[in-house]
Design a protein with these regions (language model features):
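Extreme N-terminus of proteins, especially the signal/transit-peptide cleavage junction
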Residues: 1-3, 346-347
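N-terminal Rossmann-like or analogous alpha/beta NTP/dinucleotide-binding catalytic cores
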Residues: 2-139, 257, 296-298, 302, ...
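A generic structural motif
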Residues: 11, 149-150, 208
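Phosphate-binding beta-loop-alpha motif at adenosine-nucleotide cofactor sites
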Residues: 80-85, 144-153, 249
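Internal, conserved structured core segments that host functional sites
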Residues: 113-115, 119-169, 173, 194-195
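Conserved nucleotide- and phosphate/pyrophosphate-binding catalytic cores
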Residues: 157, 163-355
């Protein structure tokens, strides 16, 4: 069996460091590992419209933003197929068929759906399209016969629901769909990066993000304003590193080589944490170190983005060709699905037979 990856992001804004450590960095590593035969990276504009139906221009404008961030992070169109979701109409048909295999109560129990509904204040006014997006996501994954899906921790319930749909379809119609495996970040701190305000999730809608394309000054301003340990009021006070966003970011981004370069009085992150915990280390010093770490990590990404911004027609062509390639694959899967369901009526003359 071919080893295939499918993953993607909603184009509702520029991508941030939460996206990067949550899945983008892992995608690039998997792409360059040589272990996968095909890699599909989807810009999920149709999914973005489920809660932006009245603002399609917002979605349209961010297609290129997300594509630029992808290329800047190291996704290579020679190795990965970058495409736009709405350009693949087969995904809509697959979603429609899968809806018959999922109950309303099952979608309501999905923790990710419940959290998103609460965050967007939808409650009883939730759009049907948004409510059904776990089913749409299952169509996205199965259409490309993905064997592996690298995701952040918050998407784990979605992948579990996708696997349920695959199992149900195969049980009813025969072994047709590929059962995908979930790939989570290895670094625990990368599972979910909190917002700079200390909230549990970094979110564009909450305005608590550090974007991959932020200027050096924007990064510095955001880091220096970050929420820390509220009990660490004075430098001499003992502080908590657990649950402290500044240290969570350091866990996610810091490398051993950054200490000799930026904070040579410490041998490593463990020593820095120990000093903070016993007291005598101020938040400003730790934040300055984090700023240096993030500047070093994000500078090459920002430079590559600026280079691609000068080649927008090339980016457009990458998406156009990628969407054509993706559609061919999805069309093949849809033919298999229709055959398994015995609704490929005009593929042979069996429709003329009387049972």
């Amino acid at each position: 069996m071919k080893q295939i990856i499918l993953t993607g992001d909603r184009p509702t804004g520029r991508l941030h460091v939460g996206h990067y450590v949550g899945s983008l960095k892992e995608r690039v590593a998997l792409q360059n590992s040589g272990k996968f035969d095909e890699i599909y990276i989807m810009i999920a504009d149709a999914q973005a419209l489920t809660d932006n139906a009245e603002h399609p221009e917002k979605v349209r404008q961010n297609i290129m933003n997300v594509a630029l961030d992808y290329l800047a992070c190291g996704l290579d169109p020679e190795k990965s197929t970058l495409f736009i979701q709405s350009m693949i109409p087969e995904l809509t048909e697959l979603t429609f068929y899968y809806m018959n295999l999922v109950t309303v109560s099952r979608v309501q129990r999905n923790p990710t759906v419940k959290a998103e509904i609460q965050m967007r204040n939808f409650e009883a006014s939730i759009p049907v399209g948004f409510f059904c997006y776990p089913i749409s996501q299952a169509a996205d994954i199965t259409a490309f016969r993905a064997t592996a899906v690298p995701v952040g921790e918050d998407q784990l319930p979605m992948l579990e629901q996708c696997k349920e749909i695959v199992h149900k379809f195969n049980a009813v119609y025969g072994d047709t769909l590929v059962d995908p495996q979930i790939i989570l970040p290895k670094n625990q701190a990368c599972l979910r990066l909190p917002g700079i305000d200390g909230k549990a999730k970094m979110s564009k809608s909450l305005g608590n993000c550090i974007y991959l394309s932020d200027s050096p000054e924007d990064i510095r301003t955001k880091v220096m304003s970050m929420f820390t340990d509220p009990t660490h009021l004075r430098r001499e006070d003992p502080g908590h590193t657990e649950g402290n966003p500044v240290f969570i970011y350091l866990d996610a981004f810091c490398r051993p080589e950054y200490f000799p370069e930026f904070l040579s009085e410490y041998s490593g992150l463990d020593e820095l944490k120990a000093h903070y915990q016993r007291g005598g280390l101020g938040d400003v010093k730790v934040k300055k170190f984090l700023n240096n770490v993030l500047q070093a990590e994000l500078a090459p990404i920002r430079q590559r983005r600026e280079d691609w911004e000068k080649r927008l027609p090339d980016v457009y062509e990458i998406l156009r060709v990628g969407s054509e390639t993706a559609r061919n694959t999805a069309a093949s899967t849809l033919r298999d699905v229709r055959h398994a369901m015995r609704i490929d009526y005009f593929e042979d003359s069996n429709l003329l037979r009387k049972d």
